[in-house]
């Protein structure tokens, strides 16, 4: 009822202030804070479908009924992301430490090519700071290809350059469309924010004026008629509030609506900030973040650049991911992560913008060389000009028995038709065997089981995992709900790490197979296909047609004979 009233309230704000608004979409295309009006347990993703009637991963059930008092080994999990708050109360005891490196002595003690890499490495930093924002890959490709083909007619393109020219046409079309779309969204959010910010200020002033005239009492709709007009200011305040509230049913306290309007302003500001970054940095052809790093961006195989600040300027995303995987299950504070015996390695390579292939390749190699058994990769983009370097890193991880788990993305796209990078499909036509692609699911076993934003693909996405309204760690000892395939990915990584910990003789490929074979199926269930209103079989949206489940995975692992240990 309160939200309905706020809707009337906002409508009358527009009427009173006589400003025409654009239609707008308040959905911001990234992993976002969720609507907390849905009353579900904060730890729903750990719960069991049978006992709790929530489509969680049954982690708590696995621990209580299958793993109780069983021994486990510590597993190193690498998180390639925006950075992690390594001092967070629920993570600090689980952060990986490079025991072969002496802190702060300015020497590469372990000779791994990285000086003072105590808790990981930052590939988007330099001697004088860190990259916060960066351009999108489509912007970088647009700038590169524009120099070659902007004024070239297709008929004059040599046979050797036909493929690159076709890429230019694709890149140009996407850049032009996306830049305009983001600029329009920015303008719309900004116009609305300015309108409602002005309205809030005016109405707050009116409320305070009338409140003062009434001896400090709360201003109700019903009390406005009793306000004695003794000056022009009171007259303005009474007329303005009366006009705003005249068609709203029931008696209303103005201060309550002002509080809700303030909350709405926060949402609008989030939109303004997001699209401002996109326009100012993401699609800015003149912006160059690599002056901070000091490397050669065109040298895909350069090593040794970066710094050891594994937290960075904005560790929200990476910290949230880390908590899902392994927040301390034993300290009775905050939340419980999925895996109970992990060390988390922070490898910073993802800015507010698109990650660079060079950094991702180096990040994967760093994780593998320093003992990670599974790597979380909650990022992605539409173009990959340095794919060759990433592919080599993926193959290197495969050769070393390291599992790579990647978020499918949040565009509501079919990845069978719209590729997302990095990918298991290597440039030479070979498919990486150590790869899992993860879509996002929700808490109810109904048409809304799949996250409305999630990418999918019968040939491309392996399975789904909880990614809607996920409560986890955020910087400065805080906790927050976020959603996205970026949350589904660590939910899967957490289960993988759990298996590796309690069944240490299993190989990465065996763990991958167990995760896929043990998914929970939903025979006959039709769900809303992301990005549409069409209902399709849930089984048609991924390879397995199922949700990751820790309990079922542990049961299956107990029945599998491990591969012989290497001598």
Task: Set out the residue ranges of the language-model regions.
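Extracellular S/T/G-rich loop segment that most often corresponds to the catalytic His/Ser-adjacent loop
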Residues: 290, 402, 423-501, 505, ...
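Bacterial Sec-dependent N-terminal signal peptides
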Residues: 1-27
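Subtilisin-like serine protease catalytic core
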Residues: 62-77, 84-356, 431-434, 456-460, ...
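C-terminal subdomain of the subtilisin-like protease fold in secreted/lumenal serine endopeptidases
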Residues: 368-370, 374-377, 386-388, 433-437, ...
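Mature extracellular/periplasmic domains of secretome proteins
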Residues: 63-71, 312-315, 336-339, 354-376, ...
């Amino acid at each position: 009822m309160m939200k309905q009233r706020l809707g009337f309230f906002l409508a009358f704000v527009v009427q009173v202030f006589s400003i025409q608004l654009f239609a707008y979409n308040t959905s911001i295309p990234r992993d976002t804070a969720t609507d907390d009006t849905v009353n579900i347990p904060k730890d729903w993703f750990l719960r069991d479908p049978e006992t709790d009637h929530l489509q969680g991963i049954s982690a708590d059930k696995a621990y209580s009924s299958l793993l109780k008092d069983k021994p486990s080994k510590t597993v190193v999990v690498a998180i390639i992301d925006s950075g992690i708050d390594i001092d967070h109360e629920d993570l600090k005891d689980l952060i990986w430490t490079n025991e072969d490196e002496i802190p702060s002595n300015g020497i590469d003690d372990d000779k791994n090519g990285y000086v003072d890499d105590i808790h990981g490495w930052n590939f988007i930093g330099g001697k004088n700071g860190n990259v916060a924002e960066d351009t999108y890959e489509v912007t970088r490709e647009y700038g590169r290809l524009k120099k070659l083909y902007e004024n070239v007619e297709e008929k004059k393109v040599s046979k050797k350059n036909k493929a690159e020219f076709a890429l230019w046409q694709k890149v140009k079309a996407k850049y032009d469309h996306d830049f305009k779309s983001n600029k329009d969204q920015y303008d719309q959010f900004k116009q609305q924010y300015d309108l409602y910010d002005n309205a809030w200020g005016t109405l707050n002033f009116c409320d305070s004026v009338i409140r003062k005239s009434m001896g400090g009492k709360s201003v109700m709709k019903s009390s406005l008629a009793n306000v004695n007009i003794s000056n022009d200011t009171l007259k303005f305040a009474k007329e303005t509030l009366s006009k705003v509230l005249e068609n709203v049913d029931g008696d209303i306290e103005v201060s309550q609506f002002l509080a809700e309007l303030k909350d709405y302003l926060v949402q609008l500001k989030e939109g303004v900030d997001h699209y401002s970054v996109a326009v100012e940095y993401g699609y800015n052809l003149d912006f160059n973040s690599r002056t901070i790093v000091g490397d050669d961006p065109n040298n895909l195989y350069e090593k040794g650049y970066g710094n050891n600040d594994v937290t960075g300027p904005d560790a929200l995303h990476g910290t949230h991911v880390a908590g899902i995987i392994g927040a301390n299950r034993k300290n009775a504070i905050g939340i419980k992560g999925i895996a109970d015996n992990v060390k988390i390695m922070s490898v910073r390579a993802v800015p507010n913008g698109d990650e660079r292939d060079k950094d991702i390749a180096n990040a994967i190699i760093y994780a593998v060389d320093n003992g990670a058994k599974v790597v979380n990769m909650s990022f992605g983009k539409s173009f990959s000009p340095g794919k060759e370097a990433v592919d080599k890193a993926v193959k290197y991880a495969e050769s070393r028995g390291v599992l790579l788990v990647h978020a499918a993305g949040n565009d509501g796209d079919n990845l069978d038709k719209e590729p997302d990078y990095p990918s298991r499909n290597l440039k030479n036509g070979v498919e990486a065997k150590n790869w899992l692609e993860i879509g996002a699911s929700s808490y109810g076993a109904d048409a809304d089981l799949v996250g409305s934003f999630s990418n999918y693909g019968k040939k491309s996405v392996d399975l789904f995992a909880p990614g809607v309204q996920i409560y986890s760690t955020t910087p400065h000892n805080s906790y927050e709900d976020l959603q996205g395939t970026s949350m589904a990915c660590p939910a899967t990584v957490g289960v993988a790490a759990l298996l590796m910990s309690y069944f240490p003789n299993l190989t990465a490929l065996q763990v991958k197979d167990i995760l896929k074979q043990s998914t929970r199926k939903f025979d006959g269930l039709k769900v809303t296909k992301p990005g549409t209103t069409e209902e399709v079989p849930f089984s048609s949206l991924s390879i397995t047609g199922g949700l990751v489940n820790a309990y079922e995975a542990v049961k299956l692992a107990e029945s599998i004979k491990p591969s012989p240990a290497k001598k």
